[in-house]
Amino acid sequence: MKRVNVFRSGVFSRLFALLLPFLLGINGLVYASAEAPAEAVHAEAAAHAEGGHESAGDVIMHHILDTGVMSFEPFGEVHLPQIVIGGFDISITRHVVMMWIASAILLVVFLLVGNRYKTMTSRQAPGGMANAMEALVEFIRLDVAKSNIGAGYEKHLPYLLTVFAFILLLNLLGLVPYGATATGNINVTLTLAVFTFFITQVASLKAHGIKGYLAHLTAGTHWALWIIMIPIEIIGLFTKPFALTVRLFANMTAGHIVILSLIFISFILKSYIVAMFVSVPFSIFIYLLEIFVAFLQAFIFTMLSALFIGLATAHEGHEGEAAH
């Protein structure tokens, strides 16, 4: 089988062209839905801490929810700027900072790998980061995009690569010290799902035209059943992004709650035995499991996005094939 260099075939240039506006769009939409209740939770937790009555639940919620304060215990904390324009709170939060960091990492990595491929000859083999990136691109290209979308998958490959790398980095940044899991913010996961939703609908319109797109809402049934089928099909359009939103949000939030709960068991019971044989071992196990889940959830979101695009663009004679 002939090996295709996706970086030299133009996929990389389209990926980079999509990356910056995609990331800026994510940040902008999350700005517009900043979580004011999270600030109240942080203020309440701080008030309890001053009085010495901070509960385990307050600490867990403070670590899970988005706030305008980045904690660097025991060195202190950084209060992020609060910005209100025209009555809209677009304050910078720690989840936004995490998305900035992930965006910067992606841009640097893609630039370095792109420059590396520009200086390579056709006989040279990629090494190090370039080799890892090529393996990742080939995996998404063949096992995710091509297998689920089929013909015309190339035009959707840059988006799928971007969303996979972005979600993966956000998941992993939530596992490092002083980090925060932006994918544990339902505003972030909803925004990602909205991107997939609009790309899917636009792809369907291009593949079938307006007439074919509207005909799909009737599911090929007799006109007498349209009053039933059309609402069902419309609901079905929105259940897909809803499933993407909740799946990623719930999985990334649950793991952190479990880890924090296990750690607090030893403090609640005030037992070194519990800490040594329950809290620490199980927390380490869940933490390692979270690393696996970080990769798994990024893959699932990307694969489902490709599957939805494939189902939306498949012609009637190939729908069964796309579904498989």
Swiss-Prot record:
UniProt subcellular location: Cell inner membrane
Span of the signal peptide: 1-33
InterPro entries according to UniProt: ATP_synth_F0_asu, ATP_synth_F0_asu_AS, ATP_synth_F0_asu_bact/mt, F0_ATP_A_sf
One Gene Ontology CC term in the entry: plasma membrane
Protein topology in the membrane: Multi-pass membrane protein
GO MF entries: proton-transporting ATP synthase activity, rotational mechanism
Highest taxon, organism lineage: Bacteria
Keywords of this entry: ATP synthesis, Cell inner membrane, Cell membrane, CF(0), Hydrogen ion transport, Ion transport, Membrane, Signal, Transmembrane, Transmembrane helix, Transport
Transmembrane annotation, as ranges: 95-115, 157-177, 179-199, 224-244, 257-277, 291-311
Transmembrane helix as UniProt keyword: yes
HAMAP family recorded: ATP_synth_a_bact (MF_01393)
Family in the record: Belongs to the ATPase A chain family.
PANTHER family to which the protein is assigned, alphabetical: ATP SYNTHASE SUBUNIT A
Subunit structure, interactors included: F-type ATPases have 2 components, CF(1) - the catalytic core - and CF(0) - the membrane proton channel. CF(1) has five subunits: alpha(3), beta(3), gamma(1), delta(1), epsilon(1). CF(0) has four main subunits: a, b, b' and c.
Function: Key component of the proton channel; it plays a direct role in the translocation of protons across the membrane.
Protein known as: ATP synthase subunit a 2
Native source organism of the sequence: Prosthecochloris aestuarii (strain DSM 271 / SK 413)
Lineage: Bacteria, Pseudomonadati, Chlorobiota, Chlorobiia, Chlorobiales
Gene (name only): atpB2
